[in-house]
């Protein structure tokens, strides 16, 4: 069967071969994507459960962003890995009607764009926390964070509508047009070049600031953990998505006809690497954060024993001194202006001493 979803094409046969011919990777793609779905979907669901508990206990913007990222990754795994690849190509083994097929394609682009762009406000949030700690709680608070997340989801969906006309550049009879070139370049800019530029610039400033203030840094502080998670997420994204962008542009402009089989193999591998990005965040969180590991273990233990998790005690109002990694709690009583509590709408209220 031909795989018409060119943006993540990794199916068992393409039009470069005769109908029914086997993919150069054999059954590797279907095995890989099946494992990716079986591993990534439960991992992201568990991540959503844990982060939901953390959001309920602590009014912290970064937890909201990571929660939104996990939800977006679930959508990517569902629409792209399950519906587009496994269901259409291997379970149903038939081409879907054009209109539903294109609608699903728009949802695929929307989910992958959301998964990428939700990390941008997280990066900005960490930049403000590290570089402008005195202003952090007046700029970043739960109510505003939720509005930003909703805006990202809506914007990514609306900007994905033009991808209804996404071209199938992988077919043998594909004829390139200027409109297709513009759409493909917009895709490359929006999913990789622009986000990576933002990540590189802001992360570089954060690293410089942390090194400059290293003598005052509070080791093991939560902001350090969140910043480490941010660096890891963005670095892995840039690494795993680079081959896919390179292969799209190479095939669009310079793939020789005699090397189409090799280009197909390399494109399949590039797409596998790109989608791997949606399934590994849970394991990164467990590796970096002891709190996340502990909560994951408790959640799994309660699930397999069919028991309720113990209710964690926390106050009705969360108090936060600062997200700066170099202000010691021992000296926090001297910083009266930085003590906040949150109202029922999640907006900060300064507490008088």
Swiss-Prot record:
Q: In which tissues is it expressed?
A: Expressed almost exclusively in the brain. Detected at very low levels in the peripheral tissues.
The record's Gene Ontology biological-process terms are: G protein-coupled receptor signaling pathway; phospholipase C-activating G protein-coupled receptor signaling pathway
Record PROSITE patterns? G_PROTEIN_RECEP_F1_2
Q: Where in the cell is it found?
A: Cell membrane
The regions listed as transmembrane in this protein's record are 30-50, 66-86, 103-123, 149-169, 182-202, 229-249, 269-289
Q: Which residues lie on this side of the membrane: Extracellular?
A: 1-29, 87-102, 170-181, 250-268
Cytoplasmic side, ranges: 51-65, 124-148, 203-228, 290-353
In its UniProt entry, the species of origin is given as: Homo sapiens
Gene Ontology, cellular component aspect: plasma membrane
CDD domains per the record? 7tmA_GPR139
Single GO MF descriptor: identical protein binding
Q: Which InterPro entries match?
A: GPCR_Rhodpsn, GPCR_Rhodpsn_7TM, GPR139, Orphan_GPCR1
Name of the protein in its database record: Probable G-protein coupled receptor 139
Membrane topology per the entry is: Multi-pass membrane protein
């Amino acid at each position: 069967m031909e795989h018409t979803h060119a943006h993540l094409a990794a199916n068992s046969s393409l039009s470069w071969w005769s109908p029914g011919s086997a993919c150069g990777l054999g059954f590797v793609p279907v095995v890989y994507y099946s494992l990716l779905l079986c591993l990534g979907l439960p991992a992201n669901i568990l991540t959503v459960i844990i982060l939901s508990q953390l959001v309920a206990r602590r009014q912290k913007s970064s937890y909201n962003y990571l929660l939104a990222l996990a939800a977006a990754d679930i959508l990517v795994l569902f629409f792209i890995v399950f519906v587009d690849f496994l269901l259409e190509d291997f379970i149903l083994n038939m081409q879907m009607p054009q209109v539903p097929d294109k609608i699903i394609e728009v949802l695929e682009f929307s989910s992958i764009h959301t998964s990428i762009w939700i990390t941008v406000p997280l990066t900005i949030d960490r930049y403000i926390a590290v570089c402008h700690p005195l202003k952090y709680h007046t700029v970043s608070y739960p109510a505003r964070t939720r509005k930003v997340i909703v805006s990202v989801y809506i914007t990514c969906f609306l900007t994905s509508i033009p991808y209804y006309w996404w071209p199938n550049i992988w077919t043998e009879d594909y004829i390139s047009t200027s409109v297709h070139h513009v759409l493909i370049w917009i895709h490359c800019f929006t999913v990789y070049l622009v986000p990576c530029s933002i990540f590189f610039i802001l992360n570089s400033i954060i690293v410089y600031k942390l090194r400059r203030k290293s003598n005052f840094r509070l080791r093991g502080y939560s902001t350090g953990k969140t910043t480490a998670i941010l660096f890891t997420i963005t670095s892995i994204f840039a690494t795993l998505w680079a081959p896919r962008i390179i292969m799209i542009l190479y095939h669009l402009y310079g793939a020789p006809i005699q090397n189409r089989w090799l280009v197909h193999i390399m494109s399949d591998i590039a797409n596998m690497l790109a989608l791997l990005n949606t399934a590994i965040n849970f394991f990164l969180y467990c590796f970096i954060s002891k709190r996340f590991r502990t909560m994951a273990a408790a959640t799994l233990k309660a699930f397999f024993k069919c028991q309720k998790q113990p209710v964690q005690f926390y106050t009705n109002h969360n108090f936060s001194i600062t997200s700066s990694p170099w202000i010691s709690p021992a000296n926090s009583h001297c910083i009266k202006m930085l003590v906040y509590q949150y109202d029922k709408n999640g907006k900060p209220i300064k507490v008088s001493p």
